[in-house]
Amino acid sequence: MYSRVLSVAAIVTMALAVQAANSTAPYGNTTNSTGTTNGTNGTNTTTSSTATQSSAASITNFSSGAFVIAMIAVACSVMSL
């Protein structure tokens, strides 16, 4: 009885881990930020900068949430044996 409940919990938790991994690993996403500055002579200057998120930061974002959920799923599957 408990093994069946734990195996179902492992499947559900692994599905949550996959969803968390998809939402927290934005590979190749770019963020654009524009800023407007007003100089002393009255001219307006608009600057823009583009920051590309590296894969290392995405791996860090992945391991923060989804890795813990995946380990809970592994623990549930091992305990269901």
Swiss-Prot record:
Sequence segments annotated as region (Disordered): 27-53
Membrane association type: Single-pass membrane protein
Transit peptide, residues from-to: 1-20
Subcellular location: Mitochondrion membrane
Domain of life: Eukaryota
Keyword annotations of the record: Membrane, Mitochondrion, Transit peptide, Transmembrane, Transmembrane helix
Major subcellular location class: mitochondrion
Keyword Mitochondrion found: yes
Stated name of the protein: Uncharacterized protein C27E2.11c, mitochondrial
Species lineage: Eukaryota, Fungi, Dikarya, Ascomycota, Taphrinomycotina
